[in-house]
Amino acid sequence: MPQPLRIGFFLDGFTLKKVNDYYRNVHRFHSCLDFRSLRLWVESQAIRYFEGDKFRELQMESHYYHPYRDPHVFARDCEGVLKLEHVLEPAGYSVHFNNPAEAGCVGPNLLLMEDALLFAMYRKLDAVVLLSTQGEYAPLPDRLRLMGIPTLVLGWDFVYPKAKSYVRWKTDSCLRRSCAHYVAMEKILDNDLNSKAPRGFFFQCEHPFSKGRNPRPKVAVGRDPHAPRRLN
């Protein structure tokens, strides 16, 4: 019986932050990615790209790399980060913070590349799935290929108006060329069938780690919320 296919799913939190901002504020779905649905979709696609749809048991570890420092240590700007952590862990992700970053700086967490290479060096992986658009990770697929490990990159390319100009967000060309397989996620997600979890990729309800979220029900001022409602 063949050994399980061991996949490492490495998610660049800096890219996902920009992508979620786009889908929440600009795109017609006005929602954020559902992490559990994303992970399950990646599992199915890993078999397709790395095994050609041949049946093989799969083992996948999912890792989310924050662009922010650990709020448990530095205790700054932690409200939204902690809420996101409480969403990621139940969805099956290990969370890694960007502690080498300076205060106030937000960017790709390069510990992602170090960890992926370390897993590969110790033969813990057969293939890697990288969700990122950032050129900082462009050397990773080539280094993994030298160890016999192919890389599937999930990237985006979209444009939207902002103020008097346009914002263009796209996958770095070097990262795209160096990987074994590339998926244009904007084409996968831009489908009404994918607009609601669990069938699709997006949260059905309000963004669960929004700073402005108020979990308490709205109550009319001056009215007892437990009083029976009068019927007209």
Report residues per predicted region.
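Nuclease catalytic cores that cleave nucleic-acid phosphodiester bonds
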Residues: 79-212
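Intrinsic, low-complexity polybasic segments
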Residues: 213-215, 221-227
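Intrinsic disorder/low-complexity signal
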Residues: 50-52, 191, 205, 223
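Single, functionally critical "micro-switch" positions that shape active/binding sites
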Residues: 11, 133, 218
